[in-house]
Amino acid sequence: MKVGHGCVRLEKRGEEQISLFDEYIYVEYNEEEYKKVVRSIKHKISEEAYACVYYACLSSEQDALDTAYRFLIKGFKIGSDITFMRNDPDVMRIKDIRRKVLHETRYFMEFARFNSIDNKVYVCHLEPESDVIYEVSLHFADRMPSENWL
């Protein structure tokens, strides 16, 4: 059995076909562990590195989580300089993923249109590729605080 970072791959559950020869470990969400990881990324690497990883987690790209994992391994070794290493393939890829997610977020902020239902609630239908609904909802919560909207 092989061990080490080179033998680990992160992916979202249900995204890939299951292989007969791989071992799958499903990780459940833990609020305490989440806070520790976020704090470690921000303090040991940088805020920008955290932002890159955050947007990679929102991405629909198949390799996004694995790229974030590889980026973090290098980031914890190198420190805050990792975000400036544009010749590294993992850094280039995570920056590209971040750019795509931010572009999709801005697209829905600009082009989302709401329809009024009985003058009580505004409804907008969005089908983003990435998980950007939360980011878009923050924008509209700020712009339409007195309205009821979905």
Q: What does each of the following model-derived ranges do?
A:
Residues M1-E31:
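N-terminal ordered "arm"
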Residues V27-L150:
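Extended, charged helical/alpha-beta scaffold domains that provide interaction surfaces
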